[in-house]
Regions:
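Residues that define the transmembrane beta-barrel architecture of outer-membrane proteins
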Residues: 31, 62-64, 116-120, 141, ...
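Surface-exposed strand-loop-strand hairpins of Gram-negative outer-membrane beta-barrel proteins
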Residues: 41-69
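Residues on the lipid-exposed face of transmembrane beta-strands in outer-membrane beta-barrel proteins
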Residues: 37-41, 68-72, 122-128, 147-151, ...
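Repeated loop/turn-to-beta-strand initiation elements of outer-membrane beta-barrel proteins
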Residues: 45, 77-80, 131-133, 205-208, ...
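Extracellular loop and loop/strand-boundary signature of outer-membrane beta-barrel proteins
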Residues: 51-57, 105-113, 132-133, 178-184, ...
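Outer-membrane beta-barrel "beta-signal"
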Residues: 121, 125, 304-329
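Gram-negative (and chloroplast) outer-membrane scaffold detector with strong preference
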Residues: 76-78, 84-169
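Flexible glycine-rich, low-complexity coil/linker segments exposed to the extracellular/periplasmic environment
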Residues: 173-178, 233-305
Length: 329
């Protein structure tokens, strides 16, 4: 991932320098604005759905995304773009993993989430083919790349055993803010948008583009899963019983699904009481191997951040520039 971003940044710098050298003379009068809408698909890549790779996420949880976008052409192949969008992402261990693959341990973890993302993005768009004349003379098609900065607001939610959706951040499911636990995470975050696209000239003033952009975020909590399990009694004492329930979902499925229970028993043996000397109960006060046990791995401990992918179409309208009339003597 780091190598990909470095390579993209080098290409970006080279493209900007080329665009700048080509635009030194006379392009200012050809600058123009465009505005439009976008309709996209949105995918999540993280602890609950890592996908084959960050370039090829799983499509099982594809959700919608839509927004408005504006573009200002400043050089023959360079534009500044701003986009406001809304979309959803989703992940579920029970769907993204199964009994036969290497991710069976995520199946046992049995966590899930959904998240709504409100994003404001600014990026630099670099066209492969330059146009140093009026917008009407632009190429019929051109590939492009973009890189920028995004600010987004998110709110991961989980579904309770009763079917209600609750805000996971409010439940501090990994002991955020408690002694020995991680810091509270913010619902407001930054991301680095990087992507590629292809633009087609529909008419003199209309363009249709398709692009794919990865959002490399600075948080590992798009899914509310990042570190280790916290003490269940402490979660209950500070944030209520729902905090404990949403933190560890293994035994919930163990009780309801005989196939799941048999697989867990075969892998780890029967569940053990959460506190030594107590009986095993059917309400989650137990643990299986390290699942649910304080300090046991709950998320990716390698420090990898969550990301999301936005793929879709942009339809934009170009505002005509000023008409310059010839002077008569």
């Amino acid at each position: 991932m780091k190598q990909f971003k470095k390579l993209f940044f080098v290409i970006f710098l080279i493209s900007v320098s080329i665009g700048t050298s080509n635009a030194q003379q006379g392009f200012k009068k050809y600058r123009y604005y465009s505005i439009g809408g976008c309709l996209n698909a949105m995918n999540y890549i993280g602890d609950l759905d890592p996908g084959p790779s960050f370039l090829s996420p799983s499509i099982k949880f594809t959700r919608y995304n839509f927004g408005v976008t504006g573009l200002y052409r400043i050089q023959p192949r360079v534009s500044l773009r701003g986009t406001i969008s809304y979309g959803r992402i989703k992940g579920d261990d029970a769907v993204s993993a199964d009994y036969e693959n290497k991710n069976v341990y995520r199946l046992y973890r049995n966590l899930s989430f959904r998240n709504q993302i409100y994003e404001v993005k600014f990026d630099v768009v670099i066209d492969l083919f330059a146009n140093a004349r009026r917008y009407t003379k632009r190429p019929d098609y051109t590939p492009y790349m973009f890189i920028g900065l995004a600010y987004f607001h998110h709110n991961p939610q989980g579904q309770t055993p009763e079917g209600d959706w609750v805000n996971l951040k409010d439940l501090h499911t990994e002991g955020q803010g408690l002694p020995g636990g991680p810091k509270n995470y913010s619902r407001n975050q930054l991301a680095l948008p990087i992507g590629l696209g292809f633009r087609y000239k529909l008419s003199k003033q209309w363009d249709l583009a398709f692009d794919m952009g990865w959002r490399f975020t600075l948080t590992d909590y798009l899914d509310d899963v990042a570190g280790v399990y916290y003490d269940k009694q402490a979660l209950t004492d500070h944030y209520g019983d729902m905090s404990r329930i949403m933190s560890d979902r293994l035994y919930e499925e163990y009780v309801a699904n005989p196939e799941f229970a048999a697989s867990v028993d075969n892998a780890f043996g029967a569940p053990q009481p959460y506190y030594p000397g107590q009986p095993v109960q059917n309400d989650g006060w137990n643990h299986t191997s390290t699942y649910g046990q304080q300090g046991g791995q709950r998320g990716d401990l390698k420090g990898r951040r969550d990301l999301y992918l936005v793929t879709g179409f942009h339809l934009t309208y170009i505002f005509p520039g000023k008409v310059v009339c010839p002077k008569f003597r």
